[in-house]
Amino acid sequence: MKKFIPMLLLAVFALGVASCKKKNEIPTPPTPQPMALEGTSWEAKGVIGIENDANIQMKAEFVKGGVMKLTVVRQPKGTAAAVNTTVFEANYVFNKPALTLTDMKMTSQAGDPLLSDAAKKNVIEIFSKGGKLVEQRPLSLVFNEKANNPIILAKVEKK
């Protein structure tokens, strides 16, 4: 019995030392998972310099099948003019951090094709440059970043 107690204490001590060594190991961070855009919604938090005479709201939704739908609602300031809604729809590919948009179509809320070829080209040029996903909270998408009028969309967090 006299030999058993010191051996038991030695075993407990050795176990304690071994567990301390495990705690001092450098933890391995989890492998980052690619962010899925499908099923997410984004709202404009900044639309700079596009128009000073109107209130503009934007909402982007990434729906199934690799399609992004951007709805733009324009309400002229100080007049009783009608609200103008435009829907942009494009295919997207997301290779972080770049979001590439292709095959853009624009329609009115009623589903009618919109705009002149020149205006279409300008809008498509802005969006075909894609966007950048900014890693900060809230997550944001930045379109037309290098121009004077970047469009910044923040992710709508589900409650």
Ranges and model annotations:
Residues M1-F4, K21-K22:
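Positively charged n-region of N-terminal signal peptides that target proteins for export
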Residues I5-F13:
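Sec-dependent N-terminal signal peptides
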Residues F13-A14, K146:
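Intrinsic disorder/low-complexity segments in short proteins, especially the signal peptide
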Residues K21-K159:
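Lipid interaction determinants
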Residues G16-S19:
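C-terminal motif of bacterial Sec signal peptides marking the signal peptidase cleavage site
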